Each structure stands twice: as C-alpha cells, then as structure tokens.
Curated annotation (Swiss-Prot):
Official protein name in the record: Large ribosomal subunit protein uL16
Keywords, ordered alphabetically: Ribonucleoprotein, Ribosomal protein, RNA-binding, rRNA-binding, tRNA-binding
GO cellular component terms listed in the entry, alphabetical order: cytosolic large ribosomal subunit
Pfam families according to UniProt: Ribosomal_L16
Amino acid sequence: MLSPKRTKYRKQQRGRMKGKATRGNRINFGEYGLVALEPAWITARQIEASRRAMTRYVRRGGQIWIRIFPDKPVTQRAAETRMGSGKGNPEYWVCVVKPGRILFEMGGVAEPIAREAMRLAAQKLPIKVKFVTKADFEKPEPAQATASEVATSSV
C-alpha cells in the first residue's frame, strides 16, 4: 500500500476540503481518466483496491497511472481509552481529494476496455466519479470567418 517514506511531523490536523481542485485536474499521461465529482478522504487501501481491480481487468494490455498519493496521517485512539491524554497514534494514510481531481489515468487500451476497468475501480471508491478522455480537455478552436461571411456581415 502507498504511504510516505518519512514525514516532517507524525500527526496532522484534519483540515477542510473547500472548493474545486486547481492542481491535478487535467489528463497528463494517458488517454483516459477517472475524475472525482465530490470531496473526500480516499484511503491507501481504497487506492490499492481500485488499482488491483483495473490491473486485473486490463491484464498486460495498457498502462495505469495513479495520480493521487495518501500523504495525510489519520490517528485513532486505542479502544476503551479514557478522554484526554493526547492525540492517538497514526493508524492509516489518506489522500485529500477535491472535485475535479484526476484519480487514475490509463493508456494503451481501447476505450470500451478502459471504461469498464475504470467502472470496476469506481466501485471501490467512496465518492462519485466520472470517466473522461483526453479529448474532453482540449479547447475547441475558434471558428475562422470566411471571406464570404465577412463580406455579408459588412452590408
């Protein structure tokens, strides 16, 4: 499972998930992607389960990129512990995901195969997601006016 090799501090505060993702919201490596539609903490176990589901379906065919990394420790108190006596110990790692963030990318396979693999991965995640292609992110070219259109518009 994914986790940082070392961190500056063992424990972090919970924080807030406001707004949309401003980074990691475009497809950079593959042809297809899975984009988050709502904010959530995604655990290292959920990322690993999604990766296994995609890899098992695609087999040797394509390549998969995991675009998120669990770098936030979540602490838990021991069972039947009285109140007070400080914060609990880190138990697992999560990735803070905002809407619009690309979670996984895939390339080297046909779109129906990628779509089904991403659907299987989406079932392992606690949020709503959407399948996107690289073409969805390309800006449409502004239409160039032809000479006949320019002549008629000046009349």
